[in-house]
Amino acid sequence: GSVADLDGDGRYEIVLKWEPSNAKDNAHGGYTGNVYIDAYKFDGTFMWRIDLGPNIRAGAHYTQFMVYDLDGDGQAEIVMKTADGTIDGEGNVIGDPNADYRNNNGYVLSGPEYLTVFHGLTGKALATIDYEPPRGNVAAWGDSYGNRVDRFLAGIAYLDGVRPSVIMAR
C-alpha cells in the first residue's frame, strides 16, 4: 500500500493493492484471479477501484505501483504496468476488453504491456503508453517460463533536479 493526497485537500488517502488468495510467485505456475488497486479516504470511505484484469498476473513481483504528485497540481497520480482488459476507476477499459493472453500454465508471456498514469481523485486512466523495455523473447531473459522477465521494480527520481520522473524497471 501507499499514502498520498489524492484529492488535493491536504490530507492523505490510502492506496491498496488487493491480491487474490491464489496469487503465485512467478516461479510457480497456475492461474490467478485479478489484482485490484483501491483508494480510500482515511475514514474508510471508498474512492475508486482499478481492476488490472486477466493479463496482469497476481503475485509479489508483478505489480509495483507508484503514487506521487507528478504534475505538481496538489493531487497525486498513480502509475503502474497495465495490459489489455485493465478497467480504470471510471469503468473504462484499456486495450482489448476480451483479450486473454494467459498460457496453459497461467503465465502471461505474450500480448501488449502498457504503462498507465491514473488520476488520483477518480482512478481514471489519463495516459497509456507501451511499457519499456518490452518483454520480447522471454527465453532471452534467462529462462522460458517468465521468472526473470516478469520481475518489476518502480520508483520516483528527480532526474533533472526539478521535476519528478517515474522509474520503472523489468
Locations of regions flagged by a protein language model:
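Beta-propeller-forming repeat regions
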Residues: G1-R170
